[in-house]
Amino acid sequence: MSALRPRISLPLDLHLAGRRPEIEVARHTLRPAGRARLDALVATPAEPRGVLVYFPGFNTPLGPWETAKCQYLAQATSMQVVLTEIPGMSRYGDPIPRAIRAEMLRGRIGAWADLNLAYLSAAIDGGWVAHTATVQALGYSTGCSLATAALPALAELGPIDGLNLVEPVAISRRNLASLEAHNMLDFGRMPLVLATNLGHDWVMSAYRRQWREPSVKYGPADLLAIATVLSGEELSWHLDDIELARCALARGSRSSLCRRADFEKVDASLQARGIGGPTVTVEGLGHQLWHSFPVVTHLIEAMLA
């Protein structure tokens, strides 16, 4: 085990520490410079010491489920938490602009990340996010790619305290058929993940209320563009070009989308560059581990607290 990059194995622990945090989460609708609408959530703890920019995964509606995650993140880090819907995957159903989609179909994420940053900037310019003395970024799945690509721009807000990547996908080169096969394998593990929430009444209440909320909408052209970005290794390339002091990594031991060999390669590269941070493995679960509230709370503590 490296002191610089400690290895942490998290057993599947169904315990959910404490009650749901009572932290205010505000919802905003953003439309910067005439662009399509996206929703944003901002969670503000008492006396925040910085901002945590959270980049969610594919097909993530900003309802009761994500609201509760924001509250936990804000409580564990004492940071203001901000996230937006992913451009091209919103409750409003507006597509990714054609020029940006064309770049994504070439495997390039930069223009899409810039579009996402425009919405984050709108939240900051609106005065809803003001605590930027330090900045952390957190991504899950697709959000890992957006977080990594956005990090140089986020550094303009304030000093980057850390990058936190849960189940990064775009660290492996594979064709679209393989990506979909791995996605289906992991999707088959979803019932086990959701079962970890049973017995926690307020979590299940949030889950049921989430199903009554509008889902995000996206078209086949945008789905293909996002899949193309995720089927390459651009996240790893961006990470190699970024200067940072700390990067925490996490994956599920049974994950197919975040392959172990490629995950280990990213960890080894960070180690060789002297970049600290834990490398966490959640035992017994796959890619969808972020849908388990017990796992989320333990991961937040291991990676961010």
Question: What are the residue ranges of the model-derived segments?
Answer:
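Active-site nucleophile elbow and catalytic-triad environment of alpha/beta-hydrolase enzymes
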Residues: 34, 221-239
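The serine-hydrolase catalytic nucleophile loop
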Residues: 59-71, 261-262
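Conserved alpha/beta-hydrolase
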Residues: 74-100
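Conserved acidic catalytic loop of the alpha/beta-hydrolase fold
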Residues: 110-134
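Flexible "cap/lid" loop of the alpha/beta hydrolase fold
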Residues: 148, 152, 160-191
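Conserved strand-to-loop "acid loop" that flanks and positions the catalytic carboxylate
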Residues: 249-255
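Conserved alpha/beta-hydrolase "acid-adjacent" motif
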Residues: 256-265
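Catalytic histidine-centered segment of alpha/beta-hydrolase-like enzymes
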Residues: 283-295
